A protein has these predicted regions:
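Hydrophobic transmembrane alpha-helices and their immediate loop junctions
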Residues: 1-148
């Protein structure tokens, strides 16, 4: 049950993060494709594996949400596209915390919203690490290219 709960809390954070990359890239006129992770060449295979492991009550799960590839864009636009995903997580984090802080939702939802907010905080911070392979690197690299 804990794994199912975790998946329900995490899925919107991952999906909205990737869709933000896609739609922002498209807004700059790029062709953008959301790639779901495959497993042994099976499209969406990683998702199928996660669902299977959840139903088998497997104690340890890993998950790769996917990634977006897009056609070439100017450096600043690429930086903005890279920031779109983490920005979505930042908005979900601060939005969730605000719902609780200002009592805008029923108290019975505080735990779920708090978990969602903390997960999005983690996704935001983790994705903004300025190392290759992370969105933070692409944000930083795009800004350096655009302004230096």
């Amino acid at each position: 049950e804990d794994i199912k709960y975790g998946a329900i809390i995490a899925a919107p954070a991952v999906v909205l993060h990737e869709l933000a990359h896609k739609f922002v890239a498209m807004s700059f006129g790029a062709n953008a494709v959301l790639h779901a992770p495959s497993l042994f060449g099976i499209p969406y295979g990683m998702y199928l594996l996660v669902i299977l492991l959840i139903h088998l009550n497997f104690p340890i799960l890993f998950f790769v949400g996917g990634y977006v590839s897009h056609t070439a864009l100017p450096a600043l636009a690429s930086s903005i596209v890279a920031f779109a995903g983490p920005l979505t997580n930042l908005i979900l984090w601060l939005g969730g915390m605000s719902l609780i802080k200002y009592g805008l939702v029923n108290r019975k939802y505080y735990t779920n919203i708090g978990m969602m907010a903390k997960l999005n905080m983690f996704f935001f911070i983790f994705n903004m690490i300025p190392l290759p392979g992370f969105d933070g690197f692409n944000v930083f690299f795009g800004l350096v290219q655009a302004f230096l």
